Swiss-Prot record:
Enzyme Commission code: 1.1.1.38
Protein name per Swiss-Prot or TrEMBL: NAD-dependent malic enzyme
One GO term describing the cellular component: cytosol
Species of origin: Shewanella amazonensis (strain ATCC BAA-1098 / SB2B)
A Pfam family assignment: Malic_M
Protein residues bound to a divalent metal cation: E243, D244, D267
Keywords: Metal-binding, NAD, Oxidoreductase
Catalytic reaction annotation: (S)-malate + NAD(+) = pyruvate + CO2 + NADH; oxaloacetate + H(+) = pyruvate + CO2
Gene giving rise to this polypeptide: maeA
Description of how the protein assembles with itself and partners: Homotetramer.
Ligand binding (NAD(+)): R154, D267, N415
Site (described: Important for activity): D267
């Protein structure tokens, strides 16, 4: 029997039920439930359906004049009635996703302490490092299956937001549920409060975090280790998603734990998976392969290099050598093109640095090879921005790229919209509508020469909810690179452009449930093949995916004794 059709037996009554967001129905409690649970008189007389409630909530939502107020309003509903919150978001997913996550969540993080209203998730502060087990036991969520955790140091493109970074785990888990069907009862947002180096926060009398410079070195590593061990004592099978850790910590943490626990880093691996999936769709629509492309990155941090490594892996899977694949990928950061003779390259950058012997014949060659120089000499067919610096894809650069590539693929992926390398409107006008554009944050359609171009949002929300659903459905104990590659290929299979050569690069958000299920199946199949999950039939796997998919519907309640 479907869980939503089974009655749920509750041992408490009265106002306590109305204060429990996972249980509260508000005006939808039936007459029988109001009597049995001592709710008569605590609610208006009318008994409403969830759709009637959602209609009222939507009218209230539309009454707010700015996106931050809309975000706060939706969070208030989430903190009082989660089922209604997810029905409202499900009914209006394209309109509300930019409100509950990027770009609005960035402003919510910046103003987190100022706008704080009600607790959600767990804050684990460094001064409490010896009581992590007790803190985890304080959570009201006892069946946690997915955790999103941040230390708040690199929030989107906004930098160190301290505990204000909690807005990111809350928002990401909201998307796990609204896009991937993960029950909110199985999710837990966590912020690791290890101090902040943001002087504005340290001086802000309203800041609610630990007022101390960020810890680092061994202290930091030992704290992360204590957290990971405590989490797996409490919930041994949990999936952990690392979110918005600084570059200096993100890759080392991932490398340390990816083979010990079921975990992944969304900034590195999720961004890579959705970008590769989008590139595969674009290549399929053009009748080419990813291994045919020449790809330039602006931004050579952990996210950019993570995408580049995923692209190299996909190119190799298409039949070219690793060396050949790497020779077709050009990484540019603030110091110019990464070259193998540069000192102080980070370990994850070294394998992606171009051999200086391969490029010293370029026109205008110098020790600092600019992005424009790379475009003029390497003649890339794909340009990807993950720099977090706005406006760096200039008209000169885009026109230079278009001069040697009839249909350039341009992905300015930096978040939020204020940090984007170039707007879709500018890119399409500079290329007379010929560029294929995808962005990290949502943008309105662009009209060029009376033709309307929908802008694909190359957002991780197309990927990580399906990964989570697949892990839960098959009981995987790891998230491998091959599972992530499978998610990319599954996303490309959902592309309207790849299917028939027309339409948007990525499917509309209204189809996100089907996309997540398709990705979940592909991810789970690879997990089983690799021995990360128990073997099962395709039919039973699909049944498990459906059984794990939660829909925002009210359940019947029955009273049981204390």
């Amino acid at each position: 029997m479907d869980d939503n059709k089974r009655p749920l037996y509750l041992p408490f009554a009265g106002p306590a039920i109305l204060e429990a967001p996972l249980i509260n129905k508000g005006s939808a409690f039936t007459e029988e439930e109001r009597i049995f649970f001592n709710l008569e008189g605590l609610l208006p007389y009318a008994i409403e359906t969830i759709e009637e409630q959602a209609s009222r909530a939507y009218d209230q939502f539309r009454s707010f004049n700015n996106d931050l107020d809309k975000h706060i309003y939706l969070r208030n509903i989430q903190d009082t009635n989660e089922t209604l919150f997810y029905r409202l978001v499900q009914n209006n997913i394209a309109e509300m996703m930019p409100i509950i996550y990027t770009p609005t969540v960035g402003l919510a993080c910046e103003r987190f302490s100022k706008n704080y209203r009600r607790n959600r998730g767990l804050f684990i502060s460094y001064p409490n490092k010896d009581r992590i087990d007790d803190i985890l036991n304080n959570s009201t969520r006892h069946k946690v299956k997915i955790i999103v955790v941040t230390d708040g140091e690199r929030i989107l493109g906004l930098g160190d937001q301290g505990i204000g970074g909690m807005g990111i785990p809350i928002g990401k888990l909201s998307l796990y549920t609204s896009c991937g069907g993960i029950s909110p009862a199985y999710t837990l947002p966590i912020t690791l409060d290890v101090g902040t180096d943001n002087p504005h926060l340290l001086e802000d009398p309203m800041y609610m975090g630990w007022r101390h410079p960020r810890i680092g070195g061994e202290e930091y590593s030992e704290f992360i280790e204590a957290f990971m061990e405590a989490v797996h004592r409490r919930w041994p099978d949990v999936l952990i998603q690392f979110e918005d850790f600084a570059q200096k910590n993100a890759m080392p943490i991932l490398e340390r734990y990816k083979d010990r626990y079921c975990c992944f880093n969304d900034d590195i691996q999720g961004t890579a998976a959705v970008t590769v999936g989008s590139l595969l769709a674009a290549c399929q629509a053009a009748g080419t392969k990813l291994s045919d492309q020449r790809i330039t990155f602006l931004g050579a941090g952990s996210a950019g290099c993570g995408i580049a490594e995923a692209i190299v892996a996909q190119m190799v899977s298409e039949g070219i050598s690793d060396d050949q694949a790497r020779s077709q990928v050009f990484m540019v950061d603030r110091w110019g093109l990464l070259l193998d003779n540069m000192p102080n390259l980070l370990p994850f950058q070294q394998k992606l640095a171009q051999k200086i012997d391969n490029i010293n014949h370029w026109d205008d060659f110098s020790d600092n090879v600019s992005l424009l120089n790379v475009v003029n000499n390497a003649k890339p067919t794909v340009l990807i921005g993950v720099s977090g610096a706005p406006g760096l894809f200039t008209e000169e650069i885009i026109r230079a790229m278009h001069s040697h590539c009839a249909r350039p693929i341009v992905f300015p992926l930096s978040n939020p919209t204020s940090r984007v390398e170039a707007t879709p409107k500018d890119i399409l006008h500079w290329t007379s509508g010929q560029a294929l554009v995808a962005t990290g944050s949502p943008f309105e359609p662009v009209v060029v020469d009376d033709v309307t171009y929908d802008i694909a949002q190359c957002n991780n929300s197309y990927i990580f909810p399906g990964i989570g659903l697949g892990v839960l459905a098959c009981g995987a104990n790891r998230v491998s690179n091959e599972m992530l590659m499978a998610s990319s290929r599954a996303l490309a299979e959902c592309s309207p452009l790849a299917k028939d050569g027309s339409g948007p690069l990525l499917p509309p958000l209204e189809e996100i449930h089907d996309v997540s299920k398709h990705i979940a199946f592909a991810v789970a199949k690879v997990a089983i093949e690799q021995g990360h999950a128990l073997d099962t039939t395709d039919e039973l796997l699909m049944q498990s995916i459906e059984a794990n998919f939660w829909y925002p519907e009210y359940r019947r309640y029955k009273r049981t004794s204390f």
